């Protein structure tokens, strides 16, 4: 048997054929830009987080009296421990940067539209799982911001009618954030990344069922090429750029994206003057704080994800790509600026004028989802020459 025949025989095996179908011979639109490379970057970030997390867990002790010291032990005594911790801590930030860019690319090019509704909804579920995983991971170092962040955020569950207080008690494992809480969060933080892997594989499988969107938003079965080697090489450029960007944070600014109060051991008797979550939670945190009522704030956070989940089902879009929708382009860039403003508001004190700015910014955020179905009706349709080949329902 020749080498070529051996290769073909190997690719016909069950597992190999699946990998070949989805990672090598997958038919890809030939006009994809670098904005379509953030999906593979997100996968790389997830692998980095799992690998570094497994090694960190070998030296971490989930106990309120030992957790903070075990983190310092990793930093000071474990060979390469400082690198593992900085890769894991900054890797979370890189993961969210990549995913946020991935989401905004999907919004700009309307990648959520038919027939990719399920792909988008799975992506929203993955995003929600990421938020939960990152939050409980932020608690594990058991510094001041870890402890008080856990206390404030978990207590929000008490806003749920009837069962809220029961849920909070279950989350805490008692009547306050304590050792039981830390143990539960450590177990969940170890488990959830593997659930994320499963959800990501479902996301990929759902995407490949109908194929990738493209910058023009026009579906064509003819103008496609194999994923390998063309888009591997194109993605490689993004991977190298990401590695350089990631390395700068690890080696030159490893603590810039964190909070200095988390280098102080948790003290239940001393409340920090300003409780701030990690930067990637700040836009959502700003929406939460903009509403004085606890129930209203929790409802607003739930509404954020409901809006994202409902977006694909507004079947009112003649043209997918924003390249041909100048009005939507302007609204999109307004949304992006608004999210950046919400991020800045989230780290400011709860006082005037920041509260008012946060309320206005939150209103603008939700108005985007309210007017998107209307904007879908504004503009010219797809040319008749593409009607037979294009799905623009």
Swiss-Prot record:
**Binding-site residues for heme b b566, renumbered to this chain:** 102, 203
- PTM description: First mitochondrial-encoded protein to be shown to have its N-terminal methionine cleaved off.
Cofactor annotation remark: Binds 2 heme b groups non-covalently.
The Gene Ontology biological process terms listed for this entry are: mitochondrial electron transport, ubiquinol to cytochrome c
- What keywords does the record list, in alphabetical order? Electron transport, Heme, Iron, Membrane, Metal-binding, Mitochondrion, Mitochondrion inner membrane, Respiratory chain, Transmembrane, Transmembrane helix, Transport, Ubiquinone
The source's domain of life comes to Eukaryota
Q: Can you name a GO cellular component term? A: mitochondrial inner membrane
Q: How does it sit in the membrane?
A: Multi-pass membrane protein
User: What cofactor does its activity depend on?
Assistant: heme b
The record's annotation in Gene3D superfamilies points to: Cytochrome Bc1 Complex, Chain C
Q: Where does heme b b562 bind?
A: 88, 189
Binding sites annotated in the UniProt record for a ubiquinone = 208
GO MF terms listed in the record are:
metal ion binding; ubiquinol-cytochrome-c reductase activity
Where is the protein localized?
Mitochondrion inner membrane
Q: Where are its TM segments located?
A: 38-58, 82-104, 119-139, 185-205, 231-251, 295-315, 327-347, 354-373
Q: How does it assemble?
A: The main subunits of complex b-c1 are: cytochrome b, cytochrome c1 and the Rieske protein.
List other remarks.
Answer: Heme 1 (or BL or b562) is low-potential and absorbs at about 562 nm, and heme 2 (or BH or b566) is high-potential and absorbs at about 566 nm.
Function according to Swiss-Prot or TrEMBL: Component of the ubiquinol-cytochrome c reductase complex (complex III or cytochrome b-c1 complex) that is part of the mitochondrial respiratory chain. The b-c1 complex mediates electron transfer from ubiquinol to cytochrome c. Contributes to the generation of a proton gradient across the mitochondrial membrane that is then used for ATP synthesis.
Q: What is stated as this protein's family in its record?
A: Belongs to the cytochrome b family.
Output this protein's name: Cytochrome b
Tell me what organism the protein belongs to.
Solanum tuberosum (Potato)
Instruction: From the UniProt record, report the name of the gene that encodes this protein.
Output: MT-CYB
